[in-house]
Structures are given as C-alpha cells and as structure tokens.
Amino acid sequence: MINPSSDSRAYREPSLLGQTVVVIGGSAGIGIETARRARAEGADVILTARDANRLQNAATEVGALRTAAFDANDPASLERFSLDLSTPIDHVMVTGPGPRYWPVMEIDFEQARLAISEHILLALWVGRNAAGKVRPGGTLVFMGGTGARRPARGLALVSAATAAMPAFVAGLALDLAPVRVNLIAAGFVDTPLSASLLGDDLDARREQLRTSLPIRRVVGPADVAALAVHIMINETLTGATYDIDGGQQLIPG
C-alpha cells in the first residue's frame, strides 16, 4: 500500500473534491468532456442541454448528479433552472454555440438576433442567474472563438459577437466579484458539431490542420476540457481570455 505522505508523486487528492460543476450544453463534445474531467477531479456534475435523450445518455455515461433539459437561450427557462438549484454551485461551464455562416445580405432579423443572443445575451443571463448561486471564488467559464481576429465572408455578425466577449467577460468579472469569470477562445475543435458542419470535408480539414498547426495535431474536446477545469481549480484566474487553437492564429493567410 502506498503511503501518500511518503511520496507526493504517488498520490494527489482530486482538486475539485466535494465541489459541484454545472455544464450548460453538457450532452456532447466539449461539454461532456468537461463533465468527465470534472468528475475525475472529484466533482459532482449537473448537466443541461436541449435534447433530453442525448442528455440522459451523457448523464449515465459520466455519472451526473442531475440533469435539466431546456434551451439556455430562453431567459425564462434559464431562470427556472437556476431557481431550482438547491445545491450550492462552485463552477459553471457554458459551452456556447458553434459557428454560423450567414452572409450579411442574406441573414434575416431573427437570425441576427440569435447570433448575438447565443453569445453576449446568454453570458449576461447566465451571469445574472449565477449571482447568489455560485460561491465566492467559484467561476463562470464561457466559450468563445479566435475566428473573429481573422475576418472571413459570411462571418461578420458572428465574428462581431465573438469579438465582444473578452470585454464583456472582463467587465462581468468585476460586476460579479468575488465570483470569477473567464473566457476560453477556441480555434477549430474536433467535435461532433464540427463533423456535422464539415461533412465529407472533415478528414481533409483534419489533415490540413495536422500538417500546418505548430503542435502537429488537431485540438480535441478533451484539450478544451482540461483548460476549463484548470481555470476552475486556479482561484487566481478571473477576467481573462485563454486561447486554445494549437497555434492556428500563427499560420499566415
């Protein structure tokens, strides 16, 4: 039997032991990987998602404390979920939407509203509902992207909403202090959503990234989850944006 006190390398107490993590958008991809990582660090997890069947499958897989199926972009549903939380919450992870390719001359008003609400308004309403629920020193972790730093056709509105997130998160960190607020800005992540968007072009995209990225591999959901849990654990981190793109921004063009 290993004596923990005799060899610190042989034993490490889980860093989130006894804590509760809410993952909004926790049924697949980055969300379920974050839940899995949090569980490995000793946390209880509460998962939310739109699709009740996928949510239940994810909950069974990771051993979630509870689930709630609702659309987080609906303020009333989000408020009901928050009011129903009897367990003190330590951390909230919001996975956020995927990219939407909407040319500005073709997008309608409701699509434009959605592009903004899926980023800024979702973060605002999560922050407001977290007040009084998340403990001091706990954290809200939001997902954004690095794509806004390199303009592209069809992404003007989504890029604008994404680009606003770092400033919003920094301000929210001041408004909600001592609750911490941070942002993860991801490049391409090899998720089921990415696969559905790229279809038959997925393998070519993966190969292109493997050969061009400085890290010589594709960023996966587990990589993002590891960063999210690190942000939860390190209680000095707040108001900041953390890029995770494998060096994608360093590639010319």
Model region roles, listed by residue range:
Residues I2-Y11, T238-G253:
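Short C-terminal tail/terminal secondary-structure segment
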Residues V189-S212, G253:
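A glycine/serine/threonine-rich, flexible loop-to-helix segment
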Residues P166, D175-D190, L237-I244:
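Conserved Rossmann-fold SDR core element
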Residues S27-A28:
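Conserved glycine-rich cofactor-binding loop
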Residues R217-I244, Q249:
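C-terminal substrate-recognition "lid" of short-chain dehydrogenase/reductases
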Residues E61-A76:
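Rossmann-fold cofactor-recognition segment
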Residues P103-V104, E110-I116, R205, L209:
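Substrate-binding pocket helix/loop in short-chain dehydrogenase/reductase
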Residues A115-I116, L124-V126, T139-A177, F188-V189:
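Catalytic loop of short-chain dehydrogenase/reductase
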